[in-house]
């Protein structure tokens, strides 16, 4: 069994929904009066989709104990999907009936994704307002800058390590 990471699923699901056409932000946990969600996707139409990413049965079971059941009290979410590796298909009884299921399979070329079950559309859904979309896009750009800062920090550490290694080689 080829283990699939959360990060691999995030990037594949973002490509699947079309990150060139949608606002897609990972790890929404504040600022929108919304429960935590792994990926929030806002389509050109203004409707939102939540994608929960689960890579283990224990993570999936723990999700059922959170109490919010992935229901947006403000009806901004049109659909809910759970993205799971193919080796977790035997755990779908923990996924709410109204949720769609995306299954990811790792192969030599990357990850394939298929829809095991389509999500039920929230009939009371409403579009995100321009202000809400701007706030979500702002959260997404904050993620980018934090990621760049982390990458730069790693680059500095690597450069320092290379200099130290060269110094060690000169000593011997």
How would you describe each model-predicted region?
Residues 41-43, 55, 103-105:
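Residue-level signal for short segments within beta-strands and strand-turn junctions
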Residues 17-32:
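A short acidic/basic microdomain associated with nuclease active sites
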Residues 74-108:
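Nucleic-acid nuclease catalytic cores
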Residues 37-50:
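Active-site beta-strand-loop-beta-strand hairpin of nuclease catalytic cores
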Residues 48-52, 57-70, 90-93:
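Active-site-adjacent loop/helix micro-motif of nuclease/hydrolase catalytic cores
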